[in-house]
Regions:
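Phosphate/nucleotide-binding beta-alpha loop and adjacent structural elements of enzyme active sites
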Residues: 1-183
């Protein structure tokens, strides 16, 4: 539950869909969050296989070779590289999201491939009210040139808040209903 953006909500009674590529993680999720749906797979721009870089601190694990290289310095180091299957977010939601269930809250934190995950969604069919996305090395002033922020804004999401590396975007229709102002 360390660094979890969703465990607090689970403890309040919310349920959801957990996705983690780290082999063996699904068992831990199922034990800690038995009411949730848990899937052990990677999400990417297209179906296939990607190299997964596992670190001595799992919070740094990534499919991004660039992020792995950037973080592979003491006290952290890559302990394993493995080819893992990945699918698009839209396909995962097609397979796992119960029919008729709306997504209120989605958090994407993939250590460097967040844009690929966001871009692989079908935003007409799967439209979370709130999207949290990690944008590494990005400040609010950088958003106009950030491809992930531009993609979300093009899908009618507006920035609401930012913490460290995580940006909170709210669907415009939800923001209007909730009387939420842009950041």
């Amino acid at each position: 539950v360390r660094y979890s953006n969703t465990y607090y909500f689970y403890r309040l009674g919310w349920t959801g869909l957990n996705v983690d590529a780290l082999p063996g993680t699904a068992n831990l999720f199922r034990r800690m969050r038995p009411k949730d749906i848990t899937v052990e797979c990677g999400i990417g721009a297209k179906e296939g296989f990607l190299t997964y870089f596992a670190f001595n601190d799992p919070a740094l694990n990534t499919f991004s070779a660039q992020e792995a290289e950037r973080k592979n310095h003491p006290p952290y180091h890559v302990v394993n590289k493995v080819q893992l299957p990945v699918m698009t977010l839209a396909k995962l939601l097609d397979q796992q999201l119960p029919k008729g269930m709306a997504i209120d809250f989605m958090t994407v934190d993939t250590e460097g491939l967040d844009h690929d995950v966001i871009a692989s969604n079908d935003w007409d069919r799967y439209r979370p009210k709130v999207v949290l996305v990690e944008l590494l090395n990005t400040g609010i002033a950088d958003l106009p040139s950030n491809p992930t922020a531009r993609l979300l804004q093009g899908q009618r999401y507006q920035l609401y808040a930012k913490t460290c590396n995580t940006f909170f975007f709210v669907a415009q229709e939800a923001a209007h209903r909730w009387n939420v102002q842009s950041a």
